[in-house]
Amino acid sequence: MNIYGRKYSVGFVTSVCTYPEYTGQGIMKRLMKKSLTRMKDSKKSFALLYPYSIPLYRRLGWEIISNKMTYVIKDTQVPKKLSEPGYVRRVEWDDKQFQHLHTKFAKKTHGCLYRNYLAWEEYFRWDEDDTMVAIYYTADDVPTGYMVYLISSNIMHIKEMIYLDREAQLGLWEYIHAHDSMIDEVRGNNYYSEPIAFELDDSDIKETIRPYAMGRIIDVKRFISQY
């Protein structure tokens, strides 16, 4: 994980639960403590989880570290008349350039997770078969951005869109606009810190911000020594 330019090996907590008849006995808290102890013993200094109850995990020492922004845009609001010098090509999900692009993005983006093979397998595990990946290339054939999307019931669902520079950002929006005869609406996720409304001529769109991941330091001395 990139934490302000430093690469950290982090642990994950997932599927923490107890049977209803055993709730209120502190079992989950003990499981959590045991998990964090094992992470610390394996030389990890930071841990992440996706909370189902923010107040609960706050009481256990976790705090929100990132937000997830979602947006809904009408087809008439998609930026148009862009003429970036590069081009977009669709690729398979296991394309090496696609995955390498995410690694380059992670290296320059605070809070971004590096993905290994297992992470990529999990990334696409629940996606529908016609989910597509499109890469933006410069005029010199250098990949600088991508988007993962699905078109269903006249709606383009953008699972992820990242770009390394302004040209790739505009080039991908140009690609989205090229689907104007096929879609009535665009729904997407935005992991950047800036709302996208400022990018549109018609900024009257729906954007929502929700807490995404929670984290906590599990080895203060090791964390600071790596920082």
Identify the function of each model-found stretch.
Residues 22, 39-40, 176:
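Hydrophobic pocket-lining residues that define ligand/cofactor binding sites across diverse proteins
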